[in-house]
Curated annotation (Swiss-Prot):
Chief place where the protein resides: membrane
Subcellular compartments: Cell inner membrane
GO biological process: protein insertion into membrane; protein transport
Subunit structure: Interacts with the Sec translocase complex via SecD. Specifically interacts with transmembrane segments of nascent integral membrane proteins during membrane integration.
Phylogenetic lineage: Bacteria, Pseudomonadati, Chlorobiota, Chlorobiia, Chlorobiales
Membrane topology of the entry: Multi-pass membrane protein
Organism of derivation: Chlorobium limicola (strain DSM 245 / NBRC 103803 / 6330)
HAMAP family: YidC_type1
Gene3D superfamilies to which the protein is assigned, alphabetical: 2.70.98.90
Family to which the UniProt record says this protein belongs: Belongs to the OXA1/ALB3/YidC family. Type 1 subfamily.
Classification via Pfam families: 60KD_IMP, YidC_periplas
Official protein name in the record: Membrane protein insertase YidC
Length: 583
C-alpha cells in the first residue's frame, strides 16, 4: 500500500462514516390509516368473553358468536423449529428456532406479540365492522395437539370458523419435517359481496422479537418490507412517537418483517391487490412492524381460495434464495449496482464453498484475505514500481513545477512527456485501492449482517459478528465506544508498519502526519465493527506487509528509464538557462 493508497483508504473510511451517519433509508411520511385496523385491546380475558351479547354484536356483527370460546393450542415440532398455533384466530403464537440461540446463547421466541399472536386475516365487512380474526375462536379440525416430524414427513393443522350456514373461513397449515417454509391456505365461503372493497388482508403484526445483546444495533436492521413490481419497498421506524406507513397497489412478490438476523415473510401464490406496511418505535429501541398482503375476493365467486407460503427463520442467503421469491432482496448489501454483486457473486459463494471443508469461519476469513491479496498482487506490484519511479523523479519534478509555476500548460506538457518516457502513471498508486473499494464496502455489509458469522468464535473473539471486546468500560467514549477490541488495535499496528516500508512521493511533513493519523483513524473506525471484519483487514494488512517486503527486495529505482531522467534534467536545465539569459 503506497501513500496514495493510504490517502485513498482514509477517504474510504471517511465516506463510510458519513454513509453510516447520513445515508439511512428515506423515512416515509405519516399518512392517514384508511385500512381496517386490528383490535388494540390485549387478549380477551375470560370475563370479556362473557360480555353481554348486545356488546359483542355491536363490536363483531355477524361474527359475534365466534368472539367467545375456549382457546386450544397445537404444537408442531420439526427439525428446525417448534411452532405453537392457537385456535383463537388460527394464528401463530410462538416460533422457537432450534439451531439459533439469542445473544445470551439461550432459546428465544421470534413472535413478539405472544398474547394475540402474529398472523391473521383483516377485513371490513358490509356492516362496517372491522374484523381481525385473532379476536375470533376457530374450531380445530385436526385431532392431534402435538405433532413431531422430520425429514420429508408432512403435518397438517386445520381450522374452521362457521359464521352461519352460508359463510365459513377455513385455514390450513402444512409443515415439512426439514424446512422453515410453511404452506398456508385460506378459503372464504360465502364472502362474495360480503366484504367492503371485496378484499381482505393477510397480515403479520408485531414485527419480530429482538435476539441480540446490542438492541440499538439490532434496531438499525429492523424493518418492514415488500417486493412490489420488481422493486424493494421498505419502511424503517427510526423515530419514537411517530408512525410510518406505506401503502401501494400492485402485484407483490412478498411482504416481510425482519430484525438483524431473522425474517418472517408472507409469499402469495396468486395475484395480490397491493401491500400495506406500518411501523413505530417503542421503548428500549424496539421497533414494532406490521406487513400485509391485500387479496381480492371476487363478487362472482361463492368460494375464494388463496395459497401462501410462510417463511419464518434465519436470514441465510442460500436458504432464502431457494424459495425463488426474491426474498433475498430484503438483505442489505449496499448499492445494487456496485456492492451487491460483489456480495452475492463473490463473497458469499466463496465463503459457502470454503465452509464445505473448513468449519471455522475465522480460518475462512484468513484464507479469503489471502486469496484477495493474491488476486490483487499484480496491481500492487505495478503500483509499487510506479511509486519507486515517481520517487526517483520527484526531486526534478518538484524543481520543474517551481520553474513552470507561471506556465501551467507548459508544465503539464513537460510532465506528460516525462511520465510517458518513464512509464509511470501519477495515479497508479491509487489504482489498487480504487479497484478494491466495491469489495471493501461489500465486505462491510456482509460481515455486518451475515448470520454465518453469528456465534462463531476465533481465538479470543467469542462471536465474529460483534466486536471482539476484551474490556467493557460501562460508559461510552465519543467516537471510540464503550469497549476495547483487540483486532482493530493489531490492525492499526500493521497499518503503521506497512506505511513505514512503503515507497512515498509525499513530503516528510505529510508522511509523518499520515504515519500516525491513519492507523489511529482505522482503530477508531473498526473498534465498533464486527470482529470478522477486523480480522479480515488485520490479516489483509499482514499479507500486505509481507508482500511489500518482497516487492521492495525485487524492485529498485534503477527501473526508471534513462531517457526519462535525461528529459527531466533537460527540462529543468532549459528553464534555468532561459532564466539566466533574461538577466
Amino acid at each position: 500500500m503506497d501513500r496514495n493508497s493510504v490517502t485513498g483508504l482514509a477517504l474510504i473510511a471517511l465516506i463510510m462514516i458519513v454513509w453510516l451517519q447520513f445515508m439511512s433509508p428515506d423515512k416515509k411520511s405519516v399518512q392517514p390509516d384508511n385500512r381496517p385496523k386490528a383490535q388494540t385491546t390485549a387478549t380477551v380475558s375470560q370475563e370479556k368473553t362473557e360480555a353481554p351479547a348486545a356488546l359483542r354484536s355491536d363490536t363483531f356483527g355477524v361474527f359475534a358468536e365466534a368472539s367467545t370460546g375456549a382457546e386450544e393450542l397445537v404444537t408442531v415440532d420439526n427439525e428446525l423449529f417448534t411452532m405453537t398455533l392457537s385456535s383463537k384466530g388460527a394464528t401463530i403464537k410462538s416460533v422457537v428456532l432450534k439451531n439459533h440461540l439469542d445473544g445470551q446463547l439461550k432459546p428465544f421466541d421470534l413472535v413478539s406479540s405472544h398474547d394475540k399472536g402474529a398472523l391473521s386475516l383483516l377485513f371490513l365487512n358490509v356492516e362496517g365492522k372491522k374484523i381481525d380474526t385473532r379476536e375470533l375462536y376457530f374450531r380445530l379440525v385436526s385431532q392431534e395437539k402435538k405433532q413431531t416430524l422430520s425429514g420429508k414427513k408432512i403435518a397438517v393443522v386445520r381450522y374452521r370458523l362457521d359464521i352461519n350456514p352460508q359463510q365459513a373461513i377455513d385455514i390450513v397449515y402444512r409443515f415439512s419435517g426439514n424446512s422453515y417454509k410453511v404452506d398456508y391456505d385460506v378459503k372464504l365461503t360465502g364472502f362474495d359481496n360480503a366484504l367492503a372493497g371485496n378484499e381482505y388482508q393477510l397480515q403479520w403484526d408485531g414485527g419480530l422479537a429482538y435476539s441480540e445483546k446490542n438492541r440499538e444495533d439490532e434496531s438499525h436492521n429492523a424493518l418492514a418490507g415488500a417486493f412490489l413490481g420488481g422493486s424493494l419497498v421498505k419502511i424503517d421506524a427510526s423515530k419514537e412517537n411517530q408512525t410510518y406507513r406505506e401503502e401501494q397497489s400492485g402485484e407483490a412478490g412478498w411482504v416481510a418483517v425482519r430484525n438483524k438476523y431473522f425474517v418472517a415473510a408472507l409469499i402469495p401464490g396468486s395475484k395480490t391487490e397491493g401491500i400495506y406496511l406500518e411501523g413505530k418505535k417503542g421503548s428500549g429501541h424496539f421497533e414494532e412492524y406490521l406487513a400485509s398482503l391485500k387479496m381480492s375476493v371476487p363478487s362472482t365467486e361463492k368460494v375464494a381460495s388463496n395459497h401462501f407460503s410462510l417463511y419464518i427463520g434465519p436470514l441465510d442467503y442460500n436458504t432464502v434464495k431457494t424459495l425463488d421469491a426474491n426474498l433475498e432482496k430484503i438483505m442489505d448489501f449496499g448499492w445494487d449496482w456496485l456492492t451487491r454483486p460483489f456480495a452475492e457473486y463473490v463473497i458469499l459463494p466463496v465463503f459457502t464453498w470454503m465452509n464445505g471443508f473448513i468449519s471455522n469461519y475465522g480460518l475462512i476469513i484468513i484464507i479469503f484475505a489471502l486469496l484477495i491479496k493474491l488476486v490483487t498482487y499484480p496491481l500492487s506490484m505495478a503500483s509499487t514500481k510506479s511509486m519507486k519511479k515517481m520517487a526517483a523523479l520527484q526531486p526534478m519534478l518538484k524543481e520543474l513545477q517551481e520553474k513552470y509555476k507561471d506556465n501551467p500548460a507548459k508544465l503539464q506538457s513537460e510532465l506528460g512527456r516525462i511520465y510517458k518516457e518513464a512509464g509511470v502513471n501519477p495515479l497508479g498508486g491509487c489504482l489498487p485501492v480504487v479497484l478494491q473499494m466495491p469489495l471493501l464496502f461489500a465486505m462491510f455489509y456482509v460481515f455486518r449482517s451475515s448470520i454465518q458469522l453469528r456465534h462463531h468464535g476465533f481465538l479470543w473473539a467469542k462471536d465474529l459478528s460483534v466486536p471482539d471486546s476484551i474490556l467493557d468500560f460501562g460508559f461510552s467514549i465519543p467516537v471510540y465506544g464503550d469497549h476495547i477490541a483487540v483486532f482493530p488495535i493489531l490492525m492499526g499496528v500493521t497499518v503503521f508498519i506497512q506505511q513505514k516500508i512503503t515507497p512515498t512521493t509525499q513530503s516528510n511533513d505529510q508522511m509523518k502526519m499520515m504515519l500516525y493519523i491513519f492507523p489511529v483513524t482505522m482503530l477508531l473506525f473498526f473498534n465498533n465493527l464486527p470482529a470478522g471484519l477486523g480480522l479480515y483487514y488485520l490479516m489483509f494488512n499482514v499479507f500486505s506487509v509481507a508482500q511489500q517486503f518482497y516487492i521492495n527486495s525485487t524492485t529498485s529505482t534503477d527501473d526508471v528509464p534513462k531517457a526519462a531522467l535525461e528529459a527531466a534534467s533537460a527540462a529543468v536545465a532549459s528553464k534555468k538557462k532561459k532564466g539566466s539569459s533574461k538577466k
